[in-house]
Amino acid sequence: MKGSSLSLEIAEPYAQALMSVSQSNNLTERFGEDIRSLLDLLNNSPELREFLSNPVIREENKKEILQRIMGDQTHPYLRNFLMLLVDKRRIAFLEQVCEQYLALLRQLTNTVLAEVVSATELNDEQRQSVIDKVKTISGAQAVELKASINPDLIGGVIIKIGSQILDASIRGQLRRISLSLGGV
């Protein structure tokens, strides 16, 4: 269901409502931080994702788990929003709602999401270099990096900004050389 048009259709109004609440209370960044933490948790815990999306599990149990996970650090408006998702039986779309909220937040703050794949983990200097390059290409004020590692790249990076892909990997360079030699 992840990424389907139906889930987007369901998630979008909830994300917009959450954005509206966060803007009217000047909490957009705070909600963004909490939502990023929640997404990390969902991505690292398939059990939690399955628990929340399981229709057999009672709403009270889902609320209790969410209360424990979110704790007192999370703003009450966001906690109440999560309880609303449970009540409306939309908690299965939590991941999509969170992703959509972050997309709206990036749009609001003129931030682009750059997905970076590298052969090894990027150090701070390399991360900053990628951020600077993405800012130049996109004209955005800020860049949110989503980094992953793929040792098959041998070296270099692949940067994806929206639908644009920049392949500066050694594997990509070797492939381009191979194609050009094959055409000779």
Curated annotation (Swiss-Prot):
<keyword id="KW-0472">Membrane</keyword>
<dbReference type="Pfam" id="PF00213">
    <property type="entry name" value="OSCP"/>
</dbReference>
<keyword id="KW-0375">Hydrogen ion transport</keyword>
<comment type="similarity">
    <text>Belongs to the ATPase delta chain family.</text>
</comment>
<keyword id="KW-0139">CF(1)</keyword>
<protein>
    <recommendedName>
        <fullName>ATP synthase subunit delta</fullName>
    </recommendedName>
</protein>
<dbReference type="InterPro" id="IPR020781">
    <property type="entry name" value="ATPase_OSCP/d_CS"/>
</dbReference>
<keyword id="KW-0793">Thylakoid</keyword>
<comment type="subunit">
    <text>F-type ATPases have 2 components, F(1) - the catalytic core - and F(0) - the membrane proton channel. F(1) has five subunits: alpha(3), beta(3), gamma(1), delta(1), epsilon(1). CF(0) has four main subunits: a(1), b(1), b'(1) and c(10-14). The alpha and beta chains form an alternating ring which encloses part of the gamma chain. F(1) is attached to F(0) by a central stalk formed by the gamma and epsilon chains, while a peripheral stalk is formed by the delta, b and b' chains.</text>
</comment>
<dbReference type="GO" id="GO:0031676">
    <property type="term" value="C:plasma membrane-derived thylakoid membrane"/>
</dbReference>
<comment type="function">
    <text>This protein is part of the stalk that links CF(0) to CF(1). It either transmits conformational changes from CF(0) to CF(1) or is implicated in proton conduction.</text>
</comment>
<keyword id="KW-0813">Transport</keyword>
<dbReference type="GO" id="GO:0046933">
    <property type="term" value="F:proton-transporting ATP synthase activity, rotational mechanism"/>
</dbReference>
<keyword id="KW-0066">ATP synthesis</keyword>
<dbReference type="InterPro" id="IPR026015">
    <property type="entry name" value="ATP_synth_OSCP/delta_N_sf"/>
</dbReference>
<keyword id="KW-0406">Ion transport</keyword>
<dbReference type="GO" id="GO:0045259">
    <property type="term" value="C:proton-transporting ATP synthase complex"/>
</dbReference>
<comment type="function">
    <text>F(1)F(0) ATP synthase produces ATP from ADP in the presence of a proton or sodium gradient. F-type ATPases consist of two structural domains, F(1) containing the extramembraneous catalytic core and F(0) containing the membrane proton channel, linked together by a central stalk and a peripheral stalk. During catalysis, ATP synthesis in the catalytic domain of F(1) is coupled via a rotary mechanism of the central stalk subunits to proton translocation.</text>
</comment>
<dbReference type="InterPro" id="IPR000711">
    <property type="entry name" value="ATPase_OSCP/dsu"/>
</dbReference>
